Design a protein with these regions (language model features):
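The feature marks the mature, well-folded catalytic cores of soluble enzymes
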Residues: 1-191
Length: 194
């Protein structure tokens, strides 16, 4: 139930560290980690111990009945701008942290589809599972017209990529790619340790 998610009552225990890389977003030297079904608090502590040069921030989304894979719920587009699944909103107290650090969180556009494709058990919110190439360029699944339109209005160059047939393998564009190697150094994107 959503009450269990809001109360952070998950099926996982705290016996052993557990985390899924898909529950982690990199914001330069800051890592945003979703506490949920596939990442427990011991796993988050493990990340803190092993990534001492990064700030680790824990988030949760009470509107998500199955909190796994943060990239269909919360996605940074460029420094200062994040899209959030409007059905799984970041709680106000956690939003305040981003607001204080000059990050705007906006609702993602509604998915163009009412159901996933055949053999896919992922959420229709793979619509917001985008691949950011740089602060001006975003790859979006080609049939997700609502998301493409929103990003275009936000000033991004939108690159449509036909990828819906791959959803049955469990993810979208962000899930199916490794980190993009970028020129320059890893930046501190103005998030502070809380």
């Amino acid at each position: 139930s959503l009450k269990w998610t809001a109360d952070k009552y998950f099926v996982t225990t705290e016996e052993e560290p557990l985390f899924d890389a898909a529950d982690v977003l990199r914001f330069g030297k800051d890592l945003i980690v979703q506490h949920g079904f596939t990442t427990n608090l011991k796993g988050i502590d493990w990340l803190r111990r092993h990534f001492k040069d990064h700030n680790i921030h824990t988030v949760n989304f009470p509107g998500d009945p199955y909190p796994i894979h943060i990239d269909a719920t919360f996605s940074p587009l460029k420094p200062g701008l994040i899209i959030n699944n409007p059905d799984r909103r970041l709680p106000d107290d956690q939003r305040e942290f981003f607001k204080k650090n000059d990050w705007e969180i906006i609702d993602a556009a509604r998915p163009a589809h009412n159901s996933p494709p055949p053999l896919c058990y992922s959420s229709v919110w793979l619509s917001m599972n985008v691949l950011v190439l740089d602060p001006k360029t975003v790859c979006v699944e080609a049939s997700e017209t609502n998301q493409m339109e929103q990003l275009d209005k936000l000033g991004f160059e939108v690159v449509p990529v036909p990828f819906r047939d791959a959803y049955a393998f469990g993810g979208g564009l962000h899930c199916a790619t490794a980190d993009v190697f970028r020129e320059g150094k890893c930046e501190n994107l103005s998030l502070i340790h809380i």
